[in-house]
Amino acid sequence: NTLWDTIEALRPDCTFVYNSVDVDFVTGRAANACLWVKSYDSDSHAWDYDLLEKTPLSDELMVELAGNRRPVLFIEGDDRHSIDMRLYSLAFPDMKVRPLGSCNKVIETVRTFNDLNSMHHLQSMGIVDRDRRTDAEVEYLRQKKILVPDVAEVENIFLLPEVIRTMATRRGKNADKILSKVRANVLRQFRAHIDEQALQHTRHKIKRDVECRIDARFNCITAMETHLRQLVNKLQPRSHYNRLRNEFLRLAEADDYLGILRVFNHKPMLSNCNLHGMLGYKSPSDYIYGVLDMLKTDSNDATHVRNAILHILHADRQDAQEKNGQTQSNNTKTVP
């Protein structure tokens, strides 16, 4: 870029046309029009091209995805070597997986990307952690093509029964016995953190409710102060806390393992349940990479675990709904 900046400065009378697939180079040419060459028909000597439109998305992202022919999956995180990136790249081998950072960035990018006329040839979806989202929040996101797993965080995927059974069998262990021990360990940890988890879930809900309710116009500071004083009674944090705590107690009493994985945000859980030790791995990281290595294989085990991941993300149902919608659209006839 420095070389070409110098050359352009020396010859302001010239128009420079660059042909490049280098994203950094293309985005480094400031204040220039970017022509996206989609294809070339040598028989008719015809080019199919478009000017990349200005969008809320970054130029780097637009250029990177312009020549991509696969559906795009946007995920959280900045590190291309993160667990999320490695796992979802293997779970969705036919998609281009792109980390974006925050969950809000994923949600906004999916919405914007799907609205772009120039990118109508590409389908895009997103994945965000469930964290402490309510069922209503999750359903809203799924309707917007944002996949939300039925586990609280990505590490919990490695505690799914299908994953544990598959890895135990591959390691020559008793799958039923190991799964039973893991379930007991997870349940014990959950019981010890029920109050804390109920409080954290309550905090998330109240924070979201405050953001919605405080976003109002006030004629004066007194009106705003009055509104804020009334918020506690309107939001009823203790009522939400008691409801959530009772719900979590019911999950524990029912030994609802999948229900606990859905709501339990606790980073040390995978390490504390000692699944890696039971399977002969030195650390939780070794176990995780063992699962990832298995997913790279062309085996029935990889297919089984991949399907379990897609199911927990509701990706299988999303695909079925889209196919059903396309079928209904194709069957619709216009009556003159």
Give the predicted meaning of each segment.
Residues N1-L57, Y287-N331, V335-P336:
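Switch/communication elements of ASCE P-loop NTPase nucleotide-binding domains
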Residues I7-P12, E64-A66, L116-M119, V138:
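Conserved catalytic network of the ASCE P-loop NTPase/AAA+ motor domain
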Residues D24-G28, D43-A46, S82, T134-E137, ...:
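Switch/connector loops and helix/strand junctions flanking conserved nucleotide-binding motifs
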Residues Y49-P56, V110-S118, L159-T169:
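Short, surface-exposed amphipathic charged segments that create phosphate/polyanion-binding patches used
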Residues P56-G67:
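Conserved interdomain hinge at the start of the Helicase C-terminal
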Residues R70-E153:
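Conserved helicase/translocase motor-coupling segment
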Residues D129, R133, Y140-R245:
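Activity-critical C-terminal alpha-helical subdomain
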Residues R213-P336:
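Extended, basic/helix-rich recognition subdomains
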